Regions:
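Polybasic/polar functional segments that serve as interface/processing modules
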Residues: 2-146
């Protein structure tokens, strides 16, 4: 198997983009909001609607003594959120394909959970249209993002 090596799309690549992936860190949010599974469920439903996505399934889990994880399966892909109320922090992952608006959905989550600080990375998801299907078999291309 090949070694891990960074991969970045270059301007010369002809990427067929199939979606947009936001990887989010948010902090300075109130502990009570981040530990409220029903509030997080409502925030996700509002975010999905605002992002013009279609909800298929929603799973929310309350951890003990604190923390919530919620995953929403969308017709357009998914949203996942994990909270650490004791740190006023949540991590979210929004992957939308098609015409959905993940940035709008993220802003709704930020507002609903009252995070004062948010940082996200937008990653276009897709493949090189010029590559042969088996061109890179056995040679994984990964990027470790720190």
């Amino acid at each position: 198997m090949g070694s891990l090596r960074p991969f970045r799309w270059s301007k010369s690549d002809r990427m067929k983009q199939v979606g947009t992936h936001l990887v989010v860190d948010a902090w300075q949010a109130p502990e009570d909001l981040l530990n409220d599974p029903e509030g997080i469920r409502r925030a996700l439903i509002d975010a999905i609607s605002a992002g013009e996505a279609t909800l298929i399934d929603l799973c929310v889990h309350q951890f003990s003594p604190h923390g919530v994880t919620a995953t929403a399966t969308l017709a357009e892909s998914h949203i996942a959120i994990h909270t650490w109320p004791e740190h006023g922090y949540f991590a979210a992952d929004l992957f939308f394909c098609g015409s959905g608006k993940p940035e709008v959905a993220m802003k709704v989550l930020q507002t609903a959970l009252k995070a004062k600080q948010v940082r996200w990375r937008e990653i276009p998801r897709g493949f090189d249209e010029t590559s042969q299907v088996n061109e890179r078999v056995g040679e994984p291309i990964y990027e470790t993002v720190l």
